[in-house]
Every structure is written in structure tokens, then in C-alpha cells.
Swiss-Prot record:
Residues 128-138, 152-170 have a biased composition (Basic and acidic residues). It comes from the Bacteria. InterPro entries: DUF1376 (IPR010781). This is Uncharacterized protein YdaU. Residues 115-139, 152-183 are annotated as: Disordered. It holds the Pfam family DUF1376. It comes from Escherichia coli (strain K12).
Length: 285
């Protein structure tokens, strides 16, 4: 029997850790077969440890086990031997091998989703560039045809006015061509970043905007993006969460994940675990 456990808490988005699912699969028959010897207290502690492991996406430090299980040190000393058989103790952390396999599957799906989003943007960009090139070629063909008609008309017509306008040849144009005005194009990669935004992460966002054909053209636009990241940072969302969520969903602007838990809250010891956005294979307890 497959039991899908829905957690009401919001989950963390794919960032420095990973995006936790809003649900996790639990095969009741397998779970009960492996845990029939546990007491009610041990069942509760084990489930809390699994939830926290799934939410944070990493092994649990040994000095936090009792706190996550909501037990006093005295009670934890009694239940620890029974729960330790479900984990691998590496000296500093408890590792759950089955959950690690499920988390790896989720990370792979999220990576593929992000790559598919970028590929979709690039495909649309290529189509637009092809359309623009075709239009330019058509316009060029039309201009050449008009020039040929005018040239033929001039050849077949005898010129009667032999007084040429020398001023047209000697006087420079009032407005020089735009390409010669010497205005340096703004490069968003040259902007000074705050120390909490990595250069590689900022480059990822700039290149994504270019792929969308919506590049960051001005310093004002770049500073506006940094202010948005700072606003979300004050709410607990890391720059990685916001930027990679926006890229995965092909947003032109920066948006924090909806219905997810800010990363900074994951570091609180009283956090109860949650799951992510793709259904992983069920795991045994």
C-alpha cells in the first residue's frame, strides 16, 4: 500500500540545498515490516528524523538528533539504539541510504527541468533570429530592385541640368551615423556586486536574460535586480533560490518560489521536514 504523506509546511526551493517535495511517498507495508519492534515514542522520533532529512536534503548532525526528535537527552539515550539501525553513523552525522537515493533522483529531475527551460528559451531565440534574418534579406532584395529601376530611368533620360550641387559633396551631414557616436554599451557583468552575490550566479542570470532576448541594458536595471534580490534575502530566500527558480520557470524578472520555505528557516532546530516538486520513488523506512 502506498501512502502519500502531505506536509502542510512550506518546502525549500532548489538552491544551496535542494527543493523539497510538498509530499513524500511512504510504503506502509514496508515501513511497518521494518519497524514493528519500535514503540510509539520511537516511531514518532524516527518519522521526525526522516522528515527533517528529506527537507534539508543532507545527513543529520549527531548533536541535533535529540532536538529534531523532540526528545530530552535522557529520553533520546533510551531510543537511540533502536533508531540507529536505520542509519549509517559516519562519526559526525547519521546517513539514511534510501533517502539519499530518493534525493539524488529529485536533484536529477530538477536539473533536467532547468536545462529544458534554458533549451526552450534558446530555441525561441534561434527562431526569432531566423525570422529577423529572413525579413532583412527580403527588405534588402526590395531595395536593390528599387535602385535598379531608378538607375535604368536615369540612363534612359538625358540630363539637362549640368550644374551639380557641390555643397552636397563637401558639407558633412548634420547628424553623424549612430555607430560613430562613441557611446560605450553598458555591460551588466562589469557592475560591482555585493559580497552575498557570487559572480558566477550573477553571470548565470545575465546570460539567461540575454537568451530571453531581454538583456539588462542599463545600470539602473542591474541595480534594480540587486535590490530585488536583497528584498528576498531579507525574507529569508537566498540569491540561488530566487535566480534558479526564475530561470527554471523562464521568468523575465526575479521572483521568490511560491509556497516554499526560505532557506534561512531550515537552519532552525525546530524545523519539521518537508519534501519537493517531483514524485520520487517510494522508499522503505
Amino acid at each position: 500500500m502506498l501512502f502519500v504523506l502531505i506536509l502542510s509546511h512550506r518546502a525549500a526551493s532548489y538552491g544551496a540545498i535542494m527543493a523539497a517535495l510538498p509530499y513524500m511517498q511512504l510504503y506502509i507495508a514496508d515501513y511497518l515490516a521494518d519497524t514493528m519492534h519500535l514503540s510509539a515514542e520511537e516511531h514518532g522520533a524516527y518519522l521526525l528524523l526522516m522528515f527533517n532529512y528529506w527537507q534539508t536534503g543532507k545527513p543529520i548532525p549527531k548533536n541535533r538528533l535529540a532536538k529534531i526528535a523532540r526528545l530530552t537527552n535522557e529520553r533520546w539515550a533510551d531510543v537511540e539504539p533502536s533508531l540507529q539501525e536505520f542509519f549509517c553513523d559516519n562519526g559526525e552525522e547519521w546517513v539514511h541510504l534510501r533517502i539519499e537515493e530518493d534525493l539524488a533522483s529529485v536533484r536529477e529531475k530538477l536539473t533536467k527541468k532547468s536545462a529544458a527551460g534554458k533549451a526552450s528559451v534558446q530555441a525561441r531565440r534561434s527562431r526569432k533570429e531566423a525570422d529577423v534574418q529572413t525579413k532583412q534579406e527580403r527588405n534588402l532584395t526590395g531595395v536593390q530592385t528599387d535602385v535598379e529601376v531608378v538607375f535604368e530611368h536615369d540612363v534612359n533620360t538625358k540630363a539637362t541640368n549640368k550644374d551639380t550641387d557641390k555643397d552636397l559633396k563637401t558639407d558633412p551631414p548634420l547628424n553623424p551615423p549612430r555607430g560613430n557616436r562613441g557611446v560605450k554599451k553598458f555591460d551588466p557583468l562589469d557592475i560591482t556586486l555585493p559580497n552575498w552575490i557570487s559572480v558566477s550566479l550573477w553571470r548565470e542570470w545575465v546570460e539567461f536574460r540575454q537568451a530571453l532576448r531581454k538583456p539588462i541594458r542599463t545600470e539602473q536595471g542591474a541595480n534594480g535586480a540587486i535590490r530585488e534580490l536583497e528584498k528576498f534575502r531579507q525574507q529569508g530566500f537566498s540569491p540561488e533560490q530566487v535566480i534558479r527558480h526564475s530561470i527554471a520557470n523562464e521568468y523575465q524578472g526575479l521572483f521568490a518560489p511560491k509556497g516554499v520555505r526560505p532557506e534561512t528557516l531550515l537552519r532552525q532546530v525546530n524545523t519539521v521536514s518537508l519534501p519537493d516538486s517531483a514524485i520520487p520513488p517510494g522508499f522503505r523506512g
